[in-house]
Amino acid sequence: MVHLTDAEKAAVSCLWGKVNSDEVGGEALGRLLVVYPWTQRYFDSFGDLSSASAIMGNAKVKAHGKKVITAFNDGLNHLDSLKGTFASLSELHCDKLHVDPENFRLLGNMIVIVLGHHLGKDFTPAAQAAFQKVVAGVATALAHKYH
């Protein structure tokens, strides 16, 4: 559960409506793979991840980023029940994919960075604080099934 004030909820909703989620997802995942190269080990099947330009132009990175942002959007629609919303994804990433749960926090930070880039001056410090709460809540929900 994420506790947002009414003003924070309004800011998140308003700004999210301005976002091209296809672009944000691919860019956020791409940045994660560039900035934290050890995360590439989870994406062996994605082909060329040899450089920043290869990663940022990789169609599989962009496609998976779109899936990530689609799930994130689902979380935005269920802020009061994030653990339930992300239960199956948490289980998948824990039991089958064996993803280090710290990576969820890192990806959340990449999402916030990309939002700042795309939204410019509209992404005020208060809006950033609200989105940081959201990505922290999503990261916690995704890590919920870890033992």
Curated annotation (Swiss-Prot):
Q: GO terms for CC?
A: hemoglobin complex; myelin sheath
Give residue ranges for domain Globin. 3-147
Sites where N-acetylvaline occurs are at 2
Binding residues annotated for heme b, in chain numbering: 64, 93
Q: Which GO terms describe its biological process?
A: carbon dioxide transport; erythrocyte development; hemopoiesis; nitric oxide transport; oxygen transport
Gene3D superfamilies according to UniProt: Globins
Recorded GO molecular functions are:
heme binding; metal ion binding; oxygen binding; oxygen carrier activity
Q: What keywords are annotated for this sequence in UniProt?
A: Acetylation, Heme, Iron, Metal-binding, Methylation, Oxygen transport, Phosphoprotein, Transport
Q: Quote the InterPro entries the UniProt record gives.
A: Globin, Globin-like_sf, Globin/Proto, Hemoglobin_b, Hemoglobin_oxygen_transport
Residues modified as Phosphoserine are 21, 45, 51
Q: What else is known?
A: The D-major sequence is shown. See also the entry for the beta D and P-minor chain.
Protein family? Belongs to the globin family.
Query: What does the UniProt record say this protein does?
Result: Involved in oxygen transport from the lung to the various peripheral tissues.
Q: What is this protein called?
A: Hemoglobin subunit beta-1
Q: Recite the lineage of the species.
A: Eukaryota, Metazoa, Chordata, Craniata, Vertebrata
